[in-house]
């Protein structure tokens, strides 16, 4: 498939890119190459291929979400430079 100059300018505008003429020509060639490759992939017979979500078996490796004991609030605030109403007091970051 031939990628014309208007398509390159449209895509560049969507991506908010300013391209020189040389960059537009290179991008056109690159996109043509990519589209050609995808066209070849579309020609493959995948009727006997089982659809998968992942090519490798993946399982959830997160731990169970369970309630656990934590430090008492007074112990955590013991070394705080500043505290207020049982909470850490930190400098204002956003106006």
From Swiss-Prot:
GO terms for molecular function: asparaginyl-tRNA synthase (glutamine-hydrolyzing) activity; ATP binding; glutaminyl-tRNA synthase (glutamine-hydrolyzing) activity. Keywords: ATP-binding, Ligase, Nucleotide-binding, Protein biosynthesis. Its EC number is 6.3.5.-. It is an enzyme of class 6 (ligase). The keyword Cell membrane does not apply. Transmembrane segments: none annotated. Gene3D superfamilies: Glu-tRNAGln amidotransferase C subunit, N-terminal domain. GO terms for biological process: glutaminyl-tRNAGln biosynthesis via transamidation; regulation of translational fidelity; translation. SUPFAM superfamilies: Glu-tRNAGln amidotransferase C subunit. It catalyses: L-glutamyl-tRNA(Gln) + L-glutamine + ATP + H2O = L-glutaminyl-tRNA(Gln) + L-glutamate + ADP + phosphate + H(+); L-aspartyl-tRNA(Asn) + L-glutamine + ATP + H2O = L-asparaginyl-tRNA(Asn) + L-glutamate + ADP + phosphate + 2 H(+). Heterotrimer of A, B and C subunits. Allows the formation of correctly charged Asn-tRNA(Asn) or Gln-tRNA(Gln) through the transamidation of misacylated Asp-tRNA(Asn) or Glu-tRNA(Gln) in organisms which lack either or both of asparaginyl-tRNA or glutaminyl-tRNA synthetases. The reaction takes place in the presence of glutamine and ATP through an activated phospho-Asp-tRNA(Asn) or phospho-Glu-tRNA(Gln). Belongs to the GatC family. This is Aspartyl/glutamyl-tRNA(Asn/Gln) amidotransferase subunit C.
């Amino acid at each position: 498939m031939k990628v014309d100059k208007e398509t390159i300018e449209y895509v560049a505008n969507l991506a908010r890119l300013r391209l020189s003429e040389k960059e537009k020509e290179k991008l056109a060639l690159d996109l043509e190459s990519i589209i050609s490759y995808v066209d070849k992939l579309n020609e493959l017979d995948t009727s006997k291929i089982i659809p998968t979500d992942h090519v490798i078996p993946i399982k959830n490796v997160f731990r169970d979400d369970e309630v656990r004991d934590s430090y008492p609030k007074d112990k955590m605030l013991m070394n705080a430079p500043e505290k207020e109403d049982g909470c850490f007091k930190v400098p204002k970051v956003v106006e």
